[in-house]
C-alpha cells in the first residue's frame, strides 16, 4: 500500500537525524517542494543554524507557516521500541523522533499548500514559510534572526500558524492563541566565607537572602486576565557552599524564572525585583535573560479561519488556550500580526517513543488547507 503524501513526507523528514541545531537536509526537501510551486527561496544561515524564508506572491495579506526542522536528542536508545530515526508504523501510529514535534506539522504544511495552490493557482495575498533548525536549542540564530531580517526591510507577516504540537487528546482540540512571556534572573548574593564555629568572623549570604527570596516567592505580581493566569515566580536552581559541613559559604546563587501575562512587562518585573532585593540590604549581582514577551491573538481573521477549519474537520470547535512554555511565536508576534499555534497531540513530545497518530496527519493537513482557503481563496 502506497503511503499518502503527508505520511511519506513525514517519514522522509523523520529519517533525517536533525538533532538541534543540525538540519540534516530536511530544509532541502522542503525547499524543493516549494520551488516547484513557484516560491522564491531565501536561505539564511547564521553561524551553526540553517533557516529559510520562502514566499509566493507579492500582495497583502501575507500568511505564513512557521516551524522547525531540528529535534531534541533521542535519549537512551534502549528505551525506544523502534529506532528513533527509522520511522515506523505500528497500530495506527507513526513512531520516530520529531513525529509530533514537529516534522508531522511540516509535512502537513507542505502538502496542504500543494493542494491549495493546485486548486487556487491565482490565490489572493501571499504565502510564506519561515523554517529554522534552532528552536529546540538556544534560539539565538533561528527564527528571531529571520524575523529581524524581514522587519528591517518592512516585510512583515500579517498572519502566521506555528506548527507546534498544541493538541492534547485529539488533533485540533486546542489552538494556542497566545503564550506567556518568560524572564530568568541569575542572582548572586555576596557574603564572607568562614568557619561555622566562628560565625562572627563570617557573613552568611544564605541567611541574609532568605527573607528577600521568600518575599519574591510570595509576591502577587498580578491577577492575570481573561486569557492568562497570574504571573508565576519559580526557583529552579540554588547553589551555595563547598560541600563541606563546616564552611559558611561566601556566595549564594539563586536562579529564578517568571512566566508572565500581558498584565506585566520585562521592565516592570526588573524594577519590582530590584526594589525587593534593595529593601533587604543585600550585596548582590543580578543578571537577566529575556526569553520573550507574552503575545495574544484574541480576535481577527486568522483566528476565525483556524477555528472554522478545525470545526470543519472535527465537527467541534477548539479550545483557545495560552498555557505551556514559550515558542517561536513570540518572535513572529513582534511584527504586529496575528499568531496562533496548531499542531499534533503533544503527549509524547521530547519523550522516548515519540509518535503521532497517522490519521491525525491527514486531519492536520486538511485543517491547514481549509485555513488557506478561508483566508486566500
UniProtKB/Swiss-Prot annotation:
An example of a Gene Ontology BP annotation on this entry? Answer: lysine biosynthetic process via diaminopimelate
Matching SUPFAM superfamilies: Bacterial exopeptidase dimerisation domain, Zn-dependent exopeptidases
Spell out the InterPro entries in the cross-references.
ArgE/DapE_CS, Bact_exopeptidase_dim_dom, DapE_proteobac, Peptidase_M20, Peptidase_M20_dimer, Peptidase_M20A
Q: Which Pfam families match?
A: M20_dimer, Peptidase_M20
- Binding site residues for Zn(2+) 2: 101, 136, 350
Give cofactor(s), names only.
Answer: Zn(2+); Co(2+)
Which keywords does this Swiss-Prot/TrEMBL entry list?
A: Amino-acid biosynthesis, Cobalt, Diaminopimelate biosynthesis, Hydrolase, Lysine biosynthesis, Metal-binding, Zinc
Q: Which residues form the active site?
A: 70, 135
Q: Give me the reactions it catalyses.
A: N-succinyl-(2S,6S)-2,6-diaminopimelate + H2O = (2S,6S)-2,6-diaminopimelate + succinate
Q: Where does Zn(2+) 1 bind?
A: 68, 101, 164
Q: How is the cofactor bound?
A: Binds 2 Zn(2+) or Co(2+) ions per subunit.
PANTHER family xref list: ACETYLORNITHINE DEACETYLASE, N-ACETYL-L-CITRULLINE DEACETYLASE
Q: What does this protein do?
A: Catalyzes the hydrolysis of N-succinyl-L,L-diaminopimelic acid (SDAP), forming succinate and LL-2,6-diaminopimelate (DAP), an intermediate involved in the bacterial biosynthesis of lysine and meso-diaminopimelic acid, an essential component of bacterial cell walls.
By its UniProt entry, which HAMAP family does this protein fall under? DapE (MF_01690)
Q: How does it assemble?
A: Homodimer.
What is the recorded name of this protein?
A: Succinyl-diaminopimelate desuccinylase
Encoding gene, per UniProt annotation: dapE
